[in-house]
Amino acid sequence: MRTTKKSSKKGIPLNLMVVGDVGLGRTAFINTLCEKPLIRHNNNFDPAEASSVSPVEIVPYQTDIILEDGTKINLTVLDTPHFGEAIDNENNFDIILQYIESQYDNVLEEESRIKRNARFCDDRVHALIYFISPTGHGLRELDIELMRRLAPRVNIIPAIAKADSLTAQELQTTKEMINADIEYYKIPVYDFPYDIEEDEEAIINLSQQLRATIPFAIVSSDRLIEMNGQTVRGRAYPWGVVEVDNPRHSDFLALRSALFATHIEDLHNITSNQLYETYRTEKLSTSQLLLDSTVGLDGKNLSQHDQVLREDRLRAIELSVQKEIEEKRRQLLAREEALRALEEKLAASTAAMANASVSTLPSSVSSTNHSQS
């Protein structure tokens, strides 16, 4: 593992996806992570939408994070509203997986071009923070299925949401049970890998500490509280204050430091050199791009005729891959259009209900008020 960051005036890109059930504090976590109100809290409950279940959406938010040493992080946070609302989340799994793979497809398509696009934007997801409900137990079937399906494509970092709802003993027990489930179901979560022969002792110790912290106990809050003459981010309770940035209360600070500083390069390397390369190999294999060697045992080159045939075949397969990528992109655009249409329909329905409720007020209300005056 390497932690040396290349300085760049443009900044270091980091694409981070946050997944978790409604009510687990995704918005609060993202705002706390970015130290700014990047996303509005949705406190408006609409009864008209309570009975309807919307598919998960993937909503990007972009901001710059400036670290204490002046390093600039070009952060893209991908929020996932509506995840976990449905009883059957199979469709939601597919939407998230399809999004992650579509970013790999974009890179694969760019690599296949003879003339590269100098302004190509690499949107591959470097890490996925998965929020686990603080039930005091281990993983649910939903948690297991999602992490098992996505782990081969993205660095998954499990976290216990709203950890301040558990006592210290409950939290420790919950961590042990979750880790036991991760090991039992062989879920390859991101475990802060290190090379004991090449990495410095300080890096090895840090990685071991972070590995022992999994799953991260997260407390999020963008509220500032005065305590002992100091201003802290936290949550106030009758029995005291839980501080977001206090390592004794929350693992938030350790996670933020790992994402933005100590392990950002490692997340990049694993995404590019392992996860993407695995996907690329699978993609090219299914497209029959991994051709059998046509060089003879004596090591002689192909004949000119065979070379021409091989190049023609490669071009044909390349066109097939590009068409498949374009088709997947069209499907994503169609899904986004359907989601927008659904949102407009729900908004129109809500407005119609509001107008109907006003127009159906009893006439006796206004006449009574008139008589009293």
Curated annotation (Swiss-Prot):
- Write down a Pfam family by its short name: Septin
Top-level taxonomic group: Eukaryota
**Alphabetized UniProt keyword annotations:** Cell cycle, Cell division, Coiled coil, Cytoplasm, GTP-binding, Mitosis, Nucleotide-binding, Phosphoprotein
A single GO cellular-component term on record = mitotic actomyosin contractile ring, proximal layer
Disulphide bridges, residue numbers: none
GO MF entry, a single one: GTP binding
Give one GO biological process term.
cytoskeleton-dependent cytokinesis
Phosphoserine carried by residues: 303
Q: Which residues bind GTP?
A: 20-27, 162-170, 235
**Region of interest (G4 motif), ranges:** 161-164
Q: Which portions of the sequence form the region G3 motif?
A: 79-82
Q: Where is this protein found? A: Cytoplasm, Cell cortex
Identify the residues that the record assigns to the Septin-type G domain, covering every copy: 10-286
Among PROSITE patterns, the record links this protein to: G_SEPTIN (PS51719)
The coiled-coil regions, if any, are: 311-357
Q: Which SUPFAM superfamilies match?
A: P-loop containing nucleoside triphosphate hydrolases
Subunit structure as annotated in this protein's UniProt entry = Component of the septin complex composed of two copies of each spn1, spn2, spn3 and spn4.
From the Swiss-Prot or TrEMBL record, give the protein name. Answer: Septin homolog spn3
Q: What organism is listed for this UniProt entry?
A: Schizosaccharomyces pombe (strain 972 / ATCC 24843)
